[in-house]
Amino acid sequence: MPPPQIKQDLNRSGWESTDFPSVCENCLPDNPYVQMLKEDYGAECKICTRPFTIFRWKADRTARTKRTTICLTCARLKNCCQCCMLDLSFGLPIVVRDAALKMVAPGPESSINREYYAQEHEKEIQEGRGAVEAYEKTDEKARELLRRLANSEPYYRKPRQQLEGPSDDSTEAQPTDAPVVQSRYGNGPGPIRTSESRRGTPLPGRGRGNMRGGRAGRPFPGTAQIPPSPEDYLPPADPNIMSLFVTGVEDDLPEHTLRTFFTQFGQLRSLICSHRAHCAFINFATREGAEAAAQHCKGKAVIQGCPLRVRWGKPKPLDNMDREERMKNAREGRLTVQAQKDGESGQRAITAAGEPATEKPQSFVVAPPPGSGDVQYSSLSGD
């Protein structure tokens, strides 16, 4: 008689095991060769609570690791991305899409019913019916509403601006009579952000308006608000100075933006940026590049909305004295040592001319002889 066979677990047989995820283009990097880490049955789906295959990858070397959060069946059922859970057709949240298409229906509550619900719909999706046909039967007006919602751009959308980038065609297509918007601070496009704008205070400056002092409650102006002086951008007399000193560097201003801004004036030898000290040193390879940058900035610049002060560097070498001054200091040192020696010899001569100096013998403590501590008693002598 053959041994009894173990009953096959139907729920375990329905666990997902796939070789490729269903992810939108925004979650994937531009490089077509993406390295992904696959983990079978790594976590449970957030919708159907079934174990599924997790995929992890990085869009960039400095980006955070992305991963899939729902299984492939639920992603196909919802027609959304496994990572960001946005609709694949319109790029909108699935809650907004279902509300516009009037496809919101109460789903199962318990974990067993969710697994059964996902298994049944997985069979329907494989057969090409079910949820796939439901999206095709939706109202055309509702789909048009979703298209308009998807095309509406907010005030600031970072991914789209990064993908498009600056183009020369768009600049040439602008009419000549359009007003030219210039920054109220200096060089650089975009609004200027200050510490007051981040805190929401109406007064300009770094001080608080309720403080009473020598300025009668008025805040002291910041470094960026003080107008630069000509000595900040005029070339110094020393031709060896080829560095610029930049102050006002914020914590979120990356170093590569400073490098990109100053590279257009000439080749850089090095760039030292200290976000803790809120300053940076830009060392140019040639004096002409440093002079061009200083003349263009005129003591101030705006990079990504961050106002900066630009001035010439002032190196302080250890040996900045000329040869005559060094020789003068050396002669003064030798004369001081000679005077000390002469003073000691004079004191010795005065002592020799007077009374002869008698050397006093040193007093030594004499140790007692051995046996002096023994006491002799008459009773012990035998008398």
UniProtKB/Swiss-Prot annotation:
Q: Where is the composition biased (Gly residues)?
A: 206-216
InterPro entries tied to this protein: Cwc2/Slt11 (IPR039171), Nucleotide-bd_a/b_plait_sf (IPR012677), RBD_domain_sf (IPR035979), RRM_dom (IPR000504), Slt11_RRM (IPR034356), STL11/RBM22-like_N (IPR048995)
Question: Does the record bear RNA-binding in its keywords?
Answer: yes
Q: Which GO terms describe its cellular component?
A: post-mRNA release spliceosomal complex; Prp19 complex; U2-type catalytic step 1 spliceosome; U2-type catalytic step 2 spliceosome
Q: Where is this region: Disordered?
A: 148-228, 330-383
Q: Does the keyword RNA-binding feature in the UniProt annotation?
A: yes
Which GO terms fall under molecular function for this chain's record?
pre-mRNA binding; U6 snRNA binding
Q: Name one Pfam family in it.
A: STL11_N
* Keywords tagged on the record: mRNA processing, mRNA splicing, Nucleus, RNA-binding, Spliceosome
| Predominant location category | nucleus
What's this protein's function?
Involved in pre-mRNA splicing. Facilitates the cooperative formation of U2/U6 helix II in association with stem II in the spliceosome. Binds to RNA.
Description of how the protein assembles with itself and partners? Associated with the spliceosome.
- Listed name of the protein: Pre-mRNA-splicing factor slt11
